[in-house]
Amino acid sequence: MKWITPASLILLLHFAASKALHENEFGIASTLDSSQCVTEKNVLSIATITFTQFVPEATEEEVNKMTSDVLAAMKKNSGDGCLESQLSVFLDEICHETELSNKYGLSGCCSQSGVERHQCLLARKKTAPASVPPFQFPEPAESCKAHEENRAVFMNRFIYEVSRRNPFMYAPAILSLAAQYDKVVLACCKADNKEECFQTKRASIAKELREGSMLNEHVCSVIRKFGSRNLQATTIIKLSQKLTEANFTEIQKLALDVAHIHEECCQGNSLECLQDGEKVMTYICSQQNILSSKIAECCKLPMIQLGFCIIHAENGVKPEGLSLNPSQFLGDRNFAQFSSEEKIMFMASFLHEYSRTHPNLPVSVILRIAKTYQEILEKCSQSGNLPGCQDNLEEELQKHIEESQALSKQSCALYQTLGDYKLQNLFLIGYTRKAPQLTSAELIDLTGKMVSIASTCCQLSEEKWSGCGEGMADIFIGHLCIRNEASPVNSGISHCCNSSYSNRRLCITSFLRDETYAPPPFSEDKFIFHKDLCQAQGKALQTMKQELLINLVKQKPELTEEQLAAVTADFSGLLEKCCKAQDQEVCFTEEGPKLISKTRDALGV
């Protein structure tokens, strides 16, 4: 984002280099301190998470051995009951295991040292390896037996299995899920209907796991792509909306620390991620009387639940009597004469005030508003007529809000009219045109997530559509960009993903079609029909139809609605005829080629 200067909104550079430093060069205090007393109880689960996320291919036995070894090494270097907690201790252990290092291709990273070794090992964490199978909860009877025999081993196995499949999920989130699952097992093993109890409660945990992992990976990807500056800006917005009663001094302090914690978590520094998160939550609860009246119930919870509760608590309400007039916010000061540091602090204070007076606006919309606001200030300060130049300022800022609200209304109207399946088909056509290089499975998964956004957000009251939609779309687009980072899709998607974080959604929305895409030669293999179409039901049949739709659009991206309707009608006719035939396979063999020929003639392919 151009409006954030190289010095960054909240300078975190010196603080990130040393935990012992409690103020940055702006004199912003920190809620954190340099004390890191780590006990054996802390280390066991954290070591499992750290080793498993860095080496997800490792077996549970290999991870347990590294955990045991690193704990012994920590104890040896400690004389006061506080164990050494530097990330390097864990990385040393990974590389010390030569057999493991060679077995899993770590020797290249382990031949390096310090920051280089750390970054090399981090680069391997981009995705969970294909060799790791999807996670499956054990059968209820098996779970109850194992949990009763050795609760600690059972829960450590859960932490291991979750960590290896979610390499970017923050340690506190994994531990919170583990605590929830522990309670589920205890409750369901005593229930009359164990199967039903486990099925219901596990579904909730699986949903939280999926959403939490996606969010954490998205944040880490944004930091990796855009650096800490965007993170600091979004942190100011989120904190100001959540803690609307807090003054700017408190928000600066918390933004500094929360942004730093995100970076620790994304660097794989699970111990500091956990401990510093606890310190910030403790501070927030100790100051709740001046920060927010909405977190009182959260602050009564155990630490393992506290963070999740505060993060998911409702945003605050706009303080009574507080208003913001953007055209008067600068006053009689000359923005052009501000130093870079003064501009940073001024824009940070604008973000704070605008966010706390608009607690329900999407974060991305506020980022766009701030970008436009600074651009107008820069231009008007140069004109010499600041008051007159700002006449249309509020109109220009309001356009961002109106665009987001209009899109959310349009999307929810479509969802309410079409329903899940037809809306997904509409998205499939659009995204196959934008990204025809993606596989059918990727496109179906991607558009399925879009339908999930609509089904979640459009159930809310209309004033919440925009905030919900923009927030979920940010994560959805973020994961498209993570896919693009791993293997570039096309130049249009790359441009949207890389040029501006705040404008990603706008860019993807306006990118209608990859004009560089050349359809492949027509292949009848993609349009062969068999009797399994008659046997397929529900989701399986829908997927088969959607794969056909994707192949049609890939073959002819400019496919019109009329052409699509005609092909769909012909295909439905084929299904009806052949599924009633005495020999379905013979019917498809005879009639299928006729449909393909008719379709090719109609589409000119």
Swiss-Prot record:
Intrachain S-S bonds: C95-C110, C109-C120, C144-C189, C188-C197, C220-C266, C265-C273, C285-C299, C298-C309, C380-C389, C412-C458, C457-C468, C481-C497, C496-C507, C534-C579, C578-C587
Any one GO molecular-function label of the UniProt entry: metal ion binding
Record key words, sorted: Copper, Disulfide bond, Glycoprotein, Metal-binding, Nickel, Phosphoprotein, Repeat, Secreted, Signal, Sulfation
CDD domains per record: ALBUMIN
Modified residues (Phosphoserine): S107, S111, S113, S340, S440
Function in brief: Binds estrogens, fatty acids and metals.
Record's protein name: Alpha-fetoprotein
Native source species: Mus musculus
GN (gene name): Afp
